[in-house]
UniProtKB/Swiss-Prot annotation:
Belongs to the HesB/IscA family. Ycf83 subfamily. NCBIfam families: iron-sulfur cluster assembly accessory protein (TIGR00049). Keywords: Chloroplast, Iron, Metal-binding, Plastid. This is Uncharacterized protein ycf83. The gene is ycf83. Transmembrane segments: none annotated. PROSITE patterns: HESB. Fe cation binds at residues 39, 105, 107. It comes from Galdieria sulphuraria (Red alga). It comes from the Eukaryota. It is found in: Plastid, Chloroplast. Gene3D superfamilies: HesB-like domain. GO terms for cellular component: chloroplast stroma. Its main location: plastid.
């Protein structure tokens, strides 16, 4: 848990640490955030980030093997989320679990 109450579940943490071991850079940087789109208005995104693209306005959370980066506008929507990971063949991958979302679409990738 960190100042902005973003929780990373053990399965997500384990998977991010395993990705980090495959990374050729010194440290793995992962950017999370929200963008306009999806059937409920906003959708989550998660992508690799270069250290040189991190600005002074970004929020940075250091873990042992990786760094999580979030812009200061997205954090308003991501406060209190849990980042989870499932290796399931159907609907597997990273999931954003947002207790503050008023509405989510059927696939869970979009919210309002």
């Amino acid at each position: 848990m960190n100042t902005y109450n973003i929780n990373i579940t053990k399965s997500a943490l384990d998977h991010l640490n395993s990705i980090s071991k495959l990374n050729s850079e010194d440290k793995l940087y992962i950017r999370i955030g929200i963008k306009q789109g999806g059937c409920s208005g906003l959708s989550y995104f998660m992508t690799y980030e270069k250290k040189s693209n991190i600005s002074d306005n970004d929020l940075v959370y250091d873990y042992d093997n990786f760094t999580l980066v979030c812009d200061n506008k997205s954090i308003l929507y991501l406060y209190g989320i849990s980042l989870d990971y499932s290796s399931s063949l159907i609907d597997g991958g990273f999931k954003f679990l947002n207790p503050n979302a008023k509405q989510t679409c059927g696939c869970g990738k979009s919210f309002s």
